[in-house]
Amino acid sequence: AVDFTHIYELVENLYCENNGRPSCDPVVLFKLVLIQHLFGIRSLRQTMRDAEVNVAYRWFLGYTMSQSLPHFATISYAFCHRFTADVIESVFRWILEEVARAGYLSPEVVFVDGTHIKANANLKKRVKKEIPVAAKRYQEQLDAEIEADRAAHGKKPLKKKDDDDDTPSTPAKQKTVTESTTDPDSGVFQKGEHRKCFAYEAHTVCDRRGYVLETEVTPGNVNDSVAFDTVFERLVEHYPEVRVVTADAGYKTPWICKQIFDSGRIPSLPYKRPMTKKGNLPWYEYVYDEYYDCILCPQNQILSYSTTNREGNREYKSKSYICKSCPVRERCTENQQCTKTVTRHVWHDYIERAEDVRHSPIGKASYVLRSQTIERVFADAKEKHAMRYTPYRGLTAVTAWVKLKFAAMNLKKLAIHRWLRLLLSAFLSYKKPDCMLAIWLL
């Protein structure tokens, strides 16, 4: 059994021992919220109605049938004003510590993905807003790499936009976004066959048994690869034993591959379809020659190095007088100057290393488990624990709601695994052990 009295230590600084009116037991408050998330109950009000008549709920809370339960508003107020994000994070970590203490946590191979949660906001109530484009977290590191690459090719350093003091500074680059007037923290989500809506995105990491190790909630219009940095940093901080990071094609970017490899770990990523125009020559027919630092086109012509741009892409260009008479020019380029340009990122070598991992036994064995791990976590959360949409508004409230839901799912999985272990020990005490059955139950 899980010792819930540890919650007293986590909330000790929020209560006064020597004065004031006796408060509701914080353990009972957390147990009621865990009941709500375990059974996918839509609200705290409905949870309290069920707890009034449910004997199992009362036994779990430590109440008899004649005792009155806390009012639902007391629980709501406590989680809105008293139990901060740090307290909820501590409860989430404490449950994971219980899982690790029981021997069920295996963070050597982890699985990363994101799922959208519909926000409590009407898509029709929106406004257009101009916001500054956020700088990339790795921009300084990329700029240093670009300058080193340009110097190696004999190119001048790129002129910084704010170097010239005589000219007014360039205004920050702006972008137009759609903002909800009901819940400004949410973002517009539209992907594949999903209906366009305001949503949040839960970027989540789990292990091979489906225990959620880390989660980060962002607006629905934030790309998975953008939120990966925060998730990965916190994951490595709490679980340095991580060795393989498995993700889908949305995470296959030069920076993510470099970040994982430089940390001494291995990315397990799938094949990513090329984003080329339909009917044009496939990308793999343009071969990079590392020795001569050039690109060979399908007609065995050389595309020489031209420059390295601000995005970190090396540009290789063909000779226009050669391309004019090329028999496949219509399928190669539509440039009016008859010049073909092929780009290659300065960190593209990390992508090629990730491709080698994809064909290795460890890459094949880990990626095939995605459907049984992280995808199963999202399916269970939405179908069994009511995470398809959130009744809360604001990034802080939704983050706390998601973490409590994943904490309840981890607790449920821990109870199932402990029951299977108890069942196995009872089975082995009466019957000759079956090795395969024992391995499956454990």
Question: What name fits each language-model region?
Answer:
Residues 1-34, 39-40, 346, 350:
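Basic, short loop/linker segments at the boundary and entry of helix-turn-helix/winged-helix-like folds
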Residues 58-62:
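Short arginine-rich
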Residues 40-53, 65-442:
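Anion-binding and metal-coordination hotspots
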